[in-house]
From Swiss-Prot:
Quaternary structure annotation from Swiss-Prot or TrEMBL: Part of the 50S ribosomal subunit.
Ribonucleoprotein keyword on record: yes
Family: Belongs to the universal ribosomal protein uL30 family.
Gene Ontology biological process terms in this record: translation
Stored Gene3D superfamilies: Ribosomal protein L30, ferredoxin-like fold domain
Protein name: Large ribosomal subunit protein uL30
Gene: rpmD
CDD domains, A to Z: Ribosomal_L30
NCBIfam families, per database record: rpmD_bact
Amino acid sequence: MDLKVTLIKSVAHRLPKQRKIVKALGLGKVNSTVVLPDNAATRGALLKIAHLISVEEVNK
């Protein structure tokens, strides 16, 4: 099981830590999407920026 993550809000005017998390996950501009593995590290990062993203579960 993987997670499809889409950035739905801009990182402008956000805390630097939140901007770094978005960049580390491979997200760039609004509406950019990445597929990430479903593990504890990924879920922890997603919780920190939950207000900026949408997450869907996808099968491999």
